[in-house]
């Protein structure tokens, strides 16, 4: 759950007050589980656009990085405390018409400092059939980025947007229009 993923940052924040040189900084904490669905009717989608579209519903586990550790950089694209890493692009593309146009480390997203936090990632995803699809977002760290400690800067805040330029909400079901990318 999101609470279970975020709780360690609260505990570490308390411990940092007593042992600042022995506690890691905040990390992304929450999982960015990309839930995509297509080929079925959704509010705000013209059923005509769905003719011939493959019906699918997939979930890919994704995450940013952990906070800087005492004496070390944080781990890139690794969640703490679960240790979940990312689902391989090939699995998502095999199970559905989803196409990953980009999946790469997000430069400088870990927060500068003597030891930086682990890097997050940039992903660009589309429906390969050029049909609309839905993203069910449950993404944290968009408004409040992971805070740096010991003089380190905060990490980069998350962002959810369409290639066409529209910004999406971090929570809730939203339409990715036909031909666009998230």
Summary of predicted features, one role per range:
Residues 1-182:
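Glycine/proline-enriched, intrinsically flexible loops and inter-domain linkers
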């Amino acid at each position: 759950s999101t609470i279970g993923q975020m709780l360690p940052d609260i505990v570490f924040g308390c411990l940092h007050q007593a042992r600042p040189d022995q506690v890691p900084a905040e990390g992304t904490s929450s999982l960015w589980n990309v839930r995509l669905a297509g080929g079925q009717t959704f509010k705000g989608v013209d059923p005509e656009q769905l003719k011939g579209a493959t019906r699918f519903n997939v979930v890919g586990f994704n995450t940013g990085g952990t906070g800087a550790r005492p004496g070390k950089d944080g781990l890139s694209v690794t969640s703490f405390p679960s240790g979940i890493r990312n689902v391989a692009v090939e699995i998502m593309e095999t199970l559905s018409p989803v196409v990953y146009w980009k999946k790469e480390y997000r430069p400088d997203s870990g927060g500068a400092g003597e030891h930086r936090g682990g890097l997050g990632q940039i992903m660009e995803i589309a429906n390969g059939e050029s049909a609309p699809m839905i993203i069910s977002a449950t993404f944290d760290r968009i408004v409040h980025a992971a805070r740096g400690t010991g003089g380190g800067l905060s990490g980069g805040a998350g962002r959810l947007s369409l290639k066409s330029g529209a910004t999406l909400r971090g929570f809730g079901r939203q339409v990715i229009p036909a031909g666009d990318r998230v």
